[in-house]
Amino acid sequence: EESKAKAYAVASEVVESKLFPLTEALTTENRILFDEHIFSLHIYEMEKVVDPDFIYQNVSGLGVGKELFGQFYDLSAGGSTDFRSGNAAFHEMLITDDTKKILSKYDQTGYASDHLPNYTGAYSGADVMPLIRIPEMYYIMAECDPDPQSSAEILDMVRFKRGIASSDATDGGKGYDEPDTREGFDSGHTRRINEVMREYLKEYYGEGQLFYFYKRHNYVTFANCSLVDVRTKYQFPLPENEDMFGITGK
C-alpha cells in the first residue's frame, strides 16, 4: 500500500503540472498525440522502418478482425465515438478475403519533417516513437487510488477526452474492487484492474505498455491469446551471446 501511495503521488504531480495536456482529437497530422509525450525516441526517417510492414504489405499478423476490433474498443457499447479507434488511428485492408484493421499510428504521412515532402519548417512530431505519454499517469492513479469511485472518475478523465460520452462513465460502485465475474474477463483480477487493463489496450495499441501491464499483474491469459497460460513468456530468453559468454549479471 505504501508503494501505491508513492506511485499515486508521483503520477499526480506530473498530471497537476499541466505540462502534458490530454489531446481531444486525433488527426492524420498528429497520430501519435505528440503533445502528450513525456519521453519518446527520435528515429530518423522512420517511414523507412514502418512503411514496409504497416503501409505496403498484406501481413495478416499485423491486422485484427473487425469483430475482435469491435470488442477491443467497445464499438457496440459506447465506444463508437472513441477517436482511438477512428480512421486516423487505423485503416482497413483486405487480407485473404477478410477485412482487417491495420494500425496507422506510425504512418508518417501528414507529418512535417525536413526529409518529408510536406515540410513547412514547423516540427509536428515526425519520426517519433512514444515511450511514456500522459494517459499512463492517469492509469497509475486509477490503479492506486484507495477510493473506488475516485479511481473510476480518473479513468474517465482520459475516456471522455477520447470522445466517449459521459453517459458511458465507468462504474466505480459495488464490486469494483472485488474479483471480476463478468463474462469474458479474467476473474483472477478485480474489476478495477480489468478496467484499467482495457484502457491500456485501447490507448497503447502498438506501443508496448499493455505487455508490461499483463506482466506486472501476472495475467494468465488475455483476449485473443492462443495460449492457455502465458506466464512463462513474460521473461524474454537471454540473447545467445550473453548466454555463451556469461554476461548475465548473475
Task: Give the predicted meaning of each segment.
Residues 1-66, 77-250:
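Acidic/polar-rich alpha-helix caps and helix-coil junctions
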Residues 72-73:
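Active-site-proximal, Lys/Arg-enriched surface segment
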